[in-house]
Each structure stands twice: as structure tokens, then as C-alpha cells.
């Protein structure tokens, strides 16, 4: 029998033994990477190193998170390599973890790409400890008072008249007209800009491009955020191409926002004041640099531009897909207000079915189906599990809005549910189960929520009063439903964005057409 003499451990070179032991430890740690610790909430099975990363692209992320919620419960965990992600799927969990413990869970995760783009000056993504967040948040809350919101109504009504006239004259270019109207309104509120009647080649086009760049940055930042070592590769070297793109985007954004703030300052120096937000930050700089003030003002556009425009488009999709709802809104308008006058902002409160329709669109197609993530500063406990310090915490807004435990027939479009209960939830459920977290939770609730709802509500009310919306059978891009598969861009995980679509828009009658023309001529 052949015998082989193997060296004993005692006879090994100490350097070889140390290297072998070190390699074994490294391999063990590598294999542990991505595994779920026993104290975490449950979640889908992991793979060594990857954790659950290999599962994240199987379907549109909000739907995937919701599928896991049905299997693993109201709070579950994911592992993305060495990162722990906690997903909240119930109103109770959100209130307990984000609202009641907001001082612990109110931070944002660090993103090398977003940080390079914002230069640490965007309060939406900055830590609660920074002066950017503290002074910026205070300034916005002090500005968006009830009296200030009331002061915007005349301009909101003007822009809605301009929009109706645009659609009357040029319905096929609906998306651009909606974009023009909303951006013109925002530029007035933030910078005191006069109403702009065109889009292309104007400050409105530049402002929209600047405001939507941060979404493109966030969508394309996965690589460097997952592998932070890429941040250390110098610009110009392989693997650092993202830095060139981000810097170009940043320079463009800063140029646009600085120019807008400069314009507001020049108007103030000339004795012209409109009560805009820029005047407030210029009057009370609180030690902030001009670039900080520019980013604070521009943050209004970052947050409000794309979201409100997408929501209005989703409302139009719903009107086309559900003509019975469109008729009910119009019948309510005619019955409550009559047929011979244009509705005004104050009429919104007299139209319960319209308000229910607006809420149902937000529930079924939330603009932000997965809220921007929070980060925990300390270990937390929930349901017998530990949510460790540094965990990234997501609110699954899509999942809560489509939860059959909360809503009857959650996949159906039924505005009537909001006429039965204030939250649209099943009759008999506690008010505490209100799943309306569309504008955030805890320390990160969007301060512009009321402004957004007031503006979009007025626009949709007047569009329904003025026009009928139909599928356009002569156009290949027409729509007849609002299904995710047919109508929405599922390549974007953190937004519910309607794909471009065509429709037919016709005035309801000659009297309304004449009223629109008269109102526009009077602007």
C-alpha cells in the first residue's frame, strides 16, 4: 500500500501557517457576507456574498417588495452584500419605527454619487445633524404657511386657464403644455418669475432639465453606491466615467439655479417683490453661502417638478381608462356648480367625488411607490427582532396601497371607497391604519405636500370641467387602460412614471370653449 508522509502542522513554516490561517478567516468572512443574522426580521433566502442582490431585478422593484411582504410580513429584511435593508409594509410599522422614533430613523443613507452631485447642500438627502437640513427645513416650514398657500391661488388659477387654452388650441402636445404650466407655477412660487406662455427655449425648459437631473443621477448611481471603492478612482480613469457625467449635470444645475436666484435678487434690488421663497432665503441667509441658498431654493423644483407632472398624467390616464368615473366627476361639477361658470379653487371642497378620484389615483399609482430610504442611528427592536444600527429602511408605499387586508379589491380603481371611509380602507378598520405616507414619514415628511395637492387638484378639476378625454384610435400610442404593463415605465424603481401616450381631448361644449378663451384673453 502506497504511503505518503504529510508535513505536520508543527513542522510548517510559521509564515505559511499564518498565511493559511489568514486565508481561512478571509474565506469564512467572505462566505458570511450576504448572510442574514439570526436576530433580523425574516426575508427571502440569501446567497453567499450577494445576499439577496441577485433577486432584485426579477420584476419591478415595488411589486417584488410587495410580493415578499405577502410572504414575510409587515417588516422583513433583505441583505445586499454587507448591507442590511429593512422593508416596512404596514401603517403600524411605519408609525412605530419612523414616526415615533424619527430622531433615530430620520437620516438618509450616504450615496457617493448623490453627494458629489449635491455637494452636501440638498436638504432632502442630508443628515439631520447638518446645518443644511436644520436651517433649510425650518425655512421651508416657515414659508409654506396657510396664509402663504392662500396667496398662491390667483397664480394657480391663471396657470390652469393657460393650460386649458393650450389644450384647446393644441391638444396633441398635452405633455409639454402640462409641463409648462406646472413649471411656470413653481418658478413663480420659488423665484417670483412672471408667467411664461411657452416651453422650448425658455427658462422653463432649463429649469425642468435641472430639476429632473437628480432623478437620473439616483437611478444610475447603483454601481458606485454598491461598490464605494469606485469613488476613489480618479476622474479620467476606467471606472470613473460616472464622475464626468455627474459633474456635467451638477454644473448645469448650479448654473440654472444660480441664475434664477440672481434674477430674484436683482428684482428685489429694483424694489420688486412678489413674496416668493427666494426673497425669504435672501432676506434671512442664516450664515449660508450663495450656493447653499441656491440649492435650497432649487430643491423646491427638484422635489415638485417631475412628481406633480407625472401625477397629472396618471389622472388623465385614469379618466381615459374609466369613462364612468369621468362622467361622474363632470355630473358632480354640473350639479354642484352649474354649467355656465368656470370652477374656482374654493369649489374643490364642494366636490367629494372628485376628491375621492384624486385620492384613488394616488393610491393605485403612487408617484413614489417606494419612499426614499431612511437610516437608523441606533439598534431598534420590533416584533421580537432587531433592526441594527446603520440599517437602510424603506417604506413600501405600493404594498400598503395594494394590501388586501386594508383595501377591498385593491387592484380595482374605485374612488367610491373614499366616500365610505376617509382613508379608503375597509369599513371598520381603525383610523390608525391610514396608509397615506405618499409624502413621507417621521422627520422626512415633505413640507410641500399641501401645495402639491392644491395645485394638482385645481388643475384636474378644471380639466374635467372643460374637456372630455378619450382614447385616440387613429394614433398607435393611444391608451385604453392604466395597467402597469402597458402604461408605465418599469425601468425606474422609485417612481411611477407614465410612458408617453396619446389621447383625444375635446371641449365639452361651445360655452366652455368660449369661457376659456375669454379667461385667457383677460390674463
Swiss-Prot record:
GO terms for cellular component: membrane. Heme binds at residue 446. It holds the Pfam family p450. It comes from the Eukaryota. Keywords: Glycoprotein, Heme, Iron, Membrane, Metal-binding, Monooxygenase, Oxidoreductase, Transmembrane, Transmembrane helix. Its cofactor is heme. Glycans are attached at residues 82, 103, 122, 295, 379, 423. This is Cytochrome P450 monooxygenase ple5B.
Amino acid at each position: 500500500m502506497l504511503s505518503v508522509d504529510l508535513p505536520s502542522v508543527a513542522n510548517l513554516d510559521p509564515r505559511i501557517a499564518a498565511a493559511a490561517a489568514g486565508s481561512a478567516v478571509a474565506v469564512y468572512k467572505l462566505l458570511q457576507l450576504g448572510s442574514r443574522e439570526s436576530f433580523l426580521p425574516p426575508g427571502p433566502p440569501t446567497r453567499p456574498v450577494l445576499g439577496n442582490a441577485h433577486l432584485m431585478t426579477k420584476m419591478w422593484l415595488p411589486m417584488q417588495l410587495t410580493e415578499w411582504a405577502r410572504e414575510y410580513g409587515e417588516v422583513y429584511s433583505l441583505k445586499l452584500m454587507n448591507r442590511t435593508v429593512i422593508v416596512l409594509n404596514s401603517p403600524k410599522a411605519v408609525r412605530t419605527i419612523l414616526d415615533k422614533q424619527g430622531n433615530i430613523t430620520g437620516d438618509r443613507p450616504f450615496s457617493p454619487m448623490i453627494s458629489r452631485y449635491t455637494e452636501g447642500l440638498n436638504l432632502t438627502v442630508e443628515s439631520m445633524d447638518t446645518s443644511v437640513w436644520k436651517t433649510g427645513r425650518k425655512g421651508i416650514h416657515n414659508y409654506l404657511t396657510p396664509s402663504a398657500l392662500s396667496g398662491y391661488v390667483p397664480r394657480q388659477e391663471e396657470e390652469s386657464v393657460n393650460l386649458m387654452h393650450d389644450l384647446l388650441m393644441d391638444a396633441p402636445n398635452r405633455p409639454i403644455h402640462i409641463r409648462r404650466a406646472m413649471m411656470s407655477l413653481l418658478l413663480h412660487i420659488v423665484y417670483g418669475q412672471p408667467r411664461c406662455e411657452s416651453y422650448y427655449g425658455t427658462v422653463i425648459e432649463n429649469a425642468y432639465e435641472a430639476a429632473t437631473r437628480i432623478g437620473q443621477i439616483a437611478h444610475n448611481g447603483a454601481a458606485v453606491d454598491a461598490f464605494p471603492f469606485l469613488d476613489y478612482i480618479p476622474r479620467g480613469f476606467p471606472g470613473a466615467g460616472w464622475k464626468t457625467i455627474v459633474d456635467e449635470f451638477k454644473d448645469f444645475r448650479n448654473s440654472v439655479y444660480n441664475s434664477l436666484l440672481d434674477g430674484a435678487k436683482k428684482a428685489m434690488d429694483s424694489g420688486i417683490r412678489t413674496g416668493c421663497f427666494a426673497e425669504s432665503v435672501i432676506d434671512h441667509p442664516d450664515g449660508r453661502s450663495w450656493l447653499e441658498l441656491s440649492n435650497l431654493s432649487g430643491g423646491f423644483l427638484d422635489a415638485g417638478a417631475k412628481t406633480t407632472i407625472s401625477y397629472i398624467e396618471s389622472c388623465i390616464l385614469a379618466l381615459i381608462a374609466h369613462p364612468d368615473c369621468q362622467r361622474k366627476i363632470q355630473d358632480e361639477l354640473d350639479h354642484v356648480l352649474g354649467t355656465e361658470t368656470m370652477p374656482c379653487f374654493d369649489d374643490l371642497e364642494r366636490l367629494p367625488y372628485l376628491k375621492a378620484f384624486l385620492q384613488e389615483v394616488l393610491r393605485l399609482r403612487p408617484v413614489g411607490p417606494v419612499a426614499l430610504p431612511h437610516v437608523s442611528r441606533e439598534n431598534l427592536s420590533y416584533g421580537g427582532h432587531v433592526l441594527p444600527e446603520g440599517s437602510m429602511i424603506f417604506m413600501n408605499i405600493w404594498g400598503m396601497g395594494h394590501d388586501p387586508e386594508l383595501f377591498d379589491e385593491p387592484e380595482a380603481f374605485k374612488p367610491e371607497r373614499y366616500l365610505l371611509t376617509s382613508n379608503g380602507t375597509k369599513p371598520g378598520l381603525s383610523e390608525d391604519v391610514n396608509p397615506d405616507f405618499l409624502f413621507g414619514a417621521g422627520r422626512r415628511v415633505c413640507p410641500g405636500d399641501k401645495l402639491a395637492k392644491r395645485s394638482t387638484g385645481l388643475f384636474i378639476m378644471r380639466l374635467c370641467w372643460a374637456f372630455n378625454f378619450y382614447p385616440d384610435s387613429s394614433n398607435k400610442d393611444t391608451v385604453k387602460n392604466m395597467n402597469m404593463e402597458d402604461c408605465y415605465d418599469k425601468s425606474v424603481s422609485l417612481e411611477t412614471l407614465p410612458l408617453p401616450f396619446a389621447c383625444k381631448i375635446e371641449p365639452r361644449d361651445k360655452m366652455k370653449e368660449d369661457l376659456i378663451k375669454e379667461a385667457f384673453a383677460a390674463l
